[in-house]
Amino acid sequence: MKKIISILFVLCLCMAASAQQHMKFMGIPLDGTVDSFALKLKAKGVTYDAAQSKAAGPGVRVFNGRFMAEDAIIRVAYIPKNKMVFSAVVELQYPTVESAHIPFLNLTESLQKKYPNTTPEENLGPDGDVIGLAFNIPDETGDNSIGFILQALKPSSSGHGVSIFLTYTDMDNFLKCEAIVNEDL
């Protein structure tokens, strides 16, 4: 009996050690279905924007809420086939580049404090210009990446002013998404 209990204990330890760690957005793991993720956002006071979600198309749901004490637009990306969440983008809008400068620097500093084991790298836009920073987020051991955060300053989605975009992506679910999309090839 002791041998069986010992074996079960070792198996439980192995399962716990191999449990996948996921990237988090607003304290919510970027994992599970979009419906489950939406409920967790709702519990944080975030509201669903049906009109913007419909305009965004399949694989994206749009929400409005607060992020770092500011009004924000939150877009959650998921795989339409199985509704698995893999990314969340927060947009903070400002009237001018100058008005976004200090918040951008403050966000950079906050990310560096929260993730001290990562060094931000330049985030390049499609034309090769630097538009922000990229943070590769390691797991607890520091051996593997659980995801990445892209911080960018770009024209606002509203067409007025500029926005700081923070894109949180879970590496494991992003790779699953790519595999599912590539099944169509």
Regions inferred by a protein language model and the residue ranges of each:
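Short N-terminal signal/transit or membrane-insertion segments
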Residues: 4, 20-21, 82-85
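Sec-dependent N-terminal signal peptides
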Residues: 4-15
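Sterically constrained small-residue positions within well-ordered secondary structures
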Residues: 10, 67, 79-81, 124-126, ...
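N-terminal cationic amphipathic segment used for targeting or macromolecule association
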Residues: 14-17, 86-88
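Non-cytosolic coordination micro-motifs
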Residues: 20-56, 92-185
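Mid-chain, structured segments of secreted extracytoplasmic proteins
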Residues: 61-107
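Short acidic-hydrophobic surface loop/beta-edge motif
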Residues: 9, 63-67, 135-137
